[in-house]
Amino acid sequence: MRLKLAATDRRPDLLKNSYRATLDLFEFIHAGILTTVQDLGRFGYQRYGVPVSGAMDLFSFEVANTLAGNDKNLASLEMTLAGPTLRVINPCRIAITGADMNPTLNGEKVDLWASQSLKTGDVLAFSSAEHGCRAYLAVSGGIHAPEVLGSRSTYLRGVFGGYRGRPIRKGDVLQGTLSDAKTRIRYVPPEYIPSYPTNLTIRVVLGPQEDFFTDSGVKTFLNSTYEISPASDRMGYRLDGPRIEHSKETEIVSDGVAVGAIQVPGDRMPIILMRDAQTTGGYPKIAHVVSSDVNRLAQLRPGDNIRFEQIDIRRAHELIYQIMNHLSSLKKEIGERHPVPEFPDGETLMRFQGAIR
């Protein structure tokens, strides 16, 4: 077993000491369609043109970390449409949430939305998602990756963050951090587990450039069904459906954009900006997806259908508070996380099950 010391991110709330122990966790036999290392995102750099990035479905991501006994922002794996197959190098504890990719451990089905212990030599395999688009794999202690601009998230177009700035490939080896997270099984009560329908109504707040569209165009937007295009990715969801009529120019002086902004370019087909979206844009924005619905949107896949429902700012704020309270209640049901220990001395190190052989 390889045991290394890695400089910490210097966050005193996570670790008071200057170093943490890392060890090899997984070797990838198959990589999956798009498997990346993500955390909650990269904040404070949009003014420099750097997107927020981070997990597409923040709810599933954060719950996975809670199940694994982690701080909510520790790096985890995001798997899209079809997951990887990996061999366990050192014992660890994991949790899987999000889309059901039929995970198996040595050929036996693994429960979703629950923690699971893995031992050396185990093979954890994922297949194609039956429902939803993205699944999350958290490991106790977090996945080790260099911090770039305050985050370990992978920004694919920028080729930085995560594992060498790229998706996981066959043969890659991921490292993790030694953790003393309790070994009891954690699970999410059934009433908290989200469903992933293929037809979804997404709530939006109109603006800021709704005056660039005719009344007929706005009605078309709010009363039509749109299909997620295969040309969708972490940067944006392109939609196929009825065209939206402009009343003015199809371009504006570039201004700032946020995750969830819905642009309508010259072809009159809407584009929903997602986590890896650019930070400015020159197309008029007819509406914004409310923050609480971006997670639901992230679980839609090409061919799924969406409709838009207009709400006001007050209602959008209420929905944010609702999802925050929902997540807080869920964490209490699961149990409070346990703090990451200081770097252990020799005797303490021996207490980590399976860490020293």
Regions found by a protein language model. Give the residues of each.
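Conserved "landmark" site that anchors the functional core of diverse proteins
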Residues: 2-5, 14-357
